[in-house]
């Protein structure tokens, strides 16, 4: 099995609920190491650039607005099959469809305020990690 890295963002809704520690615990219980982390408040240009892949989608303006409404916690996770493992513990994008015990089932309010973001593949993970972290910030 391959050791991978993936980007995870705890979104403003989950940060506001004060569940960062509970989410970190789930990463660790799944065998994922947090090898870098930072809290920040995304600017509108940062959010627009990060989510540029969705620029032509109808939800894009609301996504940018949501992601800039409060602080986020951004982390790099590392472990065996980290990308798939993180997506499994996050749960379905729509929390109503997320399996019980997943982060979104337990902490998300809606498909828009869905608590967490995770990279969807190896190339995306590399790009997303590089967007937020310099190589010397990852341990």
UniProtKB/Swiss-Prot annotation:
Group of enzyme by EC: transferase
Documented EC number(s): 2.7.4.6
Listed cofactors: Mg(2+)
UniProt keyword Secreted, yes or no: no
Gene3D superfamilies per UniProt: Nucleoside diphosphate kinase-like domain
Principal location: cytoplasm
GO biological process, one term: CTP biosynthetic process
Catalytic site positions: 117
InterPro entries assigned to the protein according to its UniProt record, in alphabetical order: NDK-like_dom, NDK-like_dom_sf, Nucleoside_diP_kinase, Nucleoside_diP_kinase_AS
CDD domains noted in UniProt: NDPk_I (cd04413)
Subcellular location: Cytoplasm
Pfam families, per the entry: NDK
Positions of ATP binding: 11, 59, 87, 93, 104, 114
Cellular component annotations (GO), alphabetically ordered: cytoplasm
Catalytic function, reaction form: a 2'-deoxyribonucleoside 5'-diphosphate + ATP = a 2'-deoxyribonucleoside 5'-triphosphate + ADP; a ribonucleoside 5'-diphosphate + ATP = a ribonucleoside 5'-triphosphate + ADP
Keywords: ATP-binding, Cytoplasm, Kinase, Magnesium, Metal-binding, Nucleotide metabolism, Nucleotide-binding, Phosphoprotein, Transferase
GO molecular function annotations of the record: ATP binding; metal ion binding; nucleoside diphosphate kinase activity
Subunit annotation: Homotetramer.
Role, per record: Major role in the synthesis of nucleoside triphosphates other than ATP. The ATP gamma phosphate is transferred to the NDP beta phosphate via a ping-pong mechanism, using a phosphorylated active-site intermediate.
Family: Belongs to the NDK family.
Name of the featured protein: Nucleoside diphosphate kinase
């Amino acid at each position: 099995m391959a050791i991978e890295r993936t980007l995870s963002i705890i979104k403003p809704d989950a940060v506001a609920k004060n569940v960062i520690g509970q989410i970190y615990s789930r990463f660790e219980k799944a065998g994922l190491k947090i090898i870098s982390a930072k809290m920040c408040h995304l600017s509108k240009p940062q959010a627009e650039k990060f989510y540029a892949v969705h620029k032509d989608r109808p939800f894009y303006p609301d996504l940018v607005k949501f992601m800039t409404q409060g602080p986020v916690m951004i982390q790099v996770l590392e472990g065996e099959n980290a990308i798939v493992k993180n997506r499994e513990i996050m749960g379905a994008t729509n929390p109503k469809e997320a399996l019980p015990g997943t982060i979104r089932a337990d902490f998300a309010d809606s498909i828009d305020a869905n608590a967490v973001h995770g990279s969807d593949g190896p190339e995306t993970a590399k790009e997303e990690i590089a967007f937020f972290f310099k190589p010397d910030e990852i341990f």
